[in-house]
């Protein structure tokens, strides 16, 4: 584990991943292949109701440089070039999408033993600029992020947070949505043998005084099967079962019931990921 603090985006990430990651309520299929030369190919297809969308992504690694190219079902081409450790602790990436001429942006990340810096700059004459910073250690860190639109000379976002991490638990508090939302999250692993873990996230809207919460759990049924559950205010219940039927190849089945949706309260989804 790094000695320094994680980037601001990672504050509260452990709890959020348990509560929301891998839940899927559509039909999704992906196939990933790799070669000894460092070239990887991933094909993904998703069926949403009667709509089918997909993309093909290639990735090539050479030394410290990684090039990703993705073509989606609407013939859009996205390219990202990442250079890792050009200088010690520095990661640089340049991305753009064709035919969108205003999509180009430059991302910089610098990790130090006592702080982490991230910046995103749009490559246009009037760019969007985002800056984020955290200070502290890998256990206790605090940070903030701000976004600025140079076209309208306005602040698009500002958030702040603090996080405390140990190997078996993590707690985080975030002030988000320009100071209008307060979020607190907690995750705790009780049994490292089967990975039995619980997590909770509480959201409070400062203006409207509304409160929301989600609690969830995760544990391994056996060495190749993971079961996740979650429950939200209002009675929404979700279940995810993920089975690794061969190394790095999984099938995930998700189900959710929301009593507030009268017409169709139940949702189901299947995701199959193959990696020969």
Curated annotation (Swiss-Prot):
InterPro entries: Porin_dom_sf (IPR023614), Porin_Euk (IPR001925), Porin_Euk/Tom40 (IPR027246). Its main location: mitochondrion. Keywords: Ion transport, Membrane, Mitochondrion, Mitochondrion outer membrane, Porin, Transmembrane, Transmembrane beta strand, Transport. The keyword Nuclease does not apply. GO terms for biological process: response to bacterium. It is found in: Mitochondrion outer membrane. One of its GO terms (cellular component) is mitochondrial outer membrane. The keyword Transmembrane applies. Gene3D superfamilies: Porin (2.40.160.10). GO terms for molecular function: porin activity; voltage-gated monoatomic anion channel activity. It comes from the Eukaryota. Signal peptide: none annotated. Forms a channel through the mitochondrial outer membrane that allows diffusion of small hydrophilic molecules. The channel adopts an open conformation at low or zero membrane potential and a closed conformation at potentials above 30-40 mV. The open state has a weak anion selectivity whereas the closed state is cation-selective. Consists mainly of membrane-spanning sided beta-sheets. Belongs to the eukaryotic mitochondrial porin (TC 1.B.8.1) family. PANTHER family: MITOCHONDRIAL OUTER MEMBRANE PROTEIN PORIN 4 (PTHR11743:SF27), VOLTAGE-DEPENDENT ANION-SELECTIVE CHANNEL (PTHR11743). This is Mitochondrial outer membrane protein porin 6. It comes from Oryza sativa subsp. japonica. The lineage of its organism: Eukaryota, Viridiplantae, Streptophyta, Embryophyta, Tracheophyta. The gene is VDAC6.
């Amino acid at each position: 584990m790094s000695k320094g603090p994680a980037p601001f985006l990672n504050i509260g990430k452990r709890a959020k991943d348990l509560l929301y990651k891998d839940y899927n309520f559509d039909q999704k299929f992906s196939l990933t292949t790799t070669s000894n030369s460092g070239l990887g190919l991933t094909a993904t297809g998703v069926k949403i109701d009667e709509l089918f969308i997909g993309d093909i992504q290639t990735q090539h690694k050479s030394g410290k440089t990684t090039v990703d190219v993705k073509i989606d079902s609407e013939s859009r081409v996205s390219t990202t070039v990442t250079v890792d450790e050009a200088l010690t602790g520095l990661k640089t990436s340049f991305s753009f999408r064709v035919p969108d001429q205003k999509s180009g942006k430059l991302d910089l990340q610098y990790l130090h033993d006592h702080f982490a810096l991230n910046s995103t700059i749009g490559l246009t004459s009037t760019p969007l600029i985002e800056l984020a910073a955290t200070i502290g250690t890998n256990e206790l860190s605090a940070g903030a992020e701000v976004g600025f639109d140079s076209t309208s000379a306005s602040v698009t976002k500002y958030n702040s947070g603090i996080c405390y991490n140990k190997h078996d638990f993590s707690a985080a508090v975030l002030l988000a949505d320009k100071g209008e939302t307060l979020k607190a999250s907690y995750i705790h692993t009780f049994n490292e043998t089967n990975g039995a873990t619980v997590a909770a996230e509480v959201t409070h809207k400062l203006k409207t005084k509304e409160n929301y919460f989600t609690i969830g759990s995760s544990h391994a049924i056996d060495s190749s099967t993971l079961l996740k559950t979650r429950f939200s205010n209002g009675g929404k219940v979700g279940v995810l079962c993920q089975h690794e039927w061969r190394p790095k190849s999984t099938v995930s089945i998700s189900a959710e019931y929301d009593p507030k949706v009268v017409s169709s309260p139940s949702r189901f989804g299947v995701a199959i990921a193959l990696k020969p």
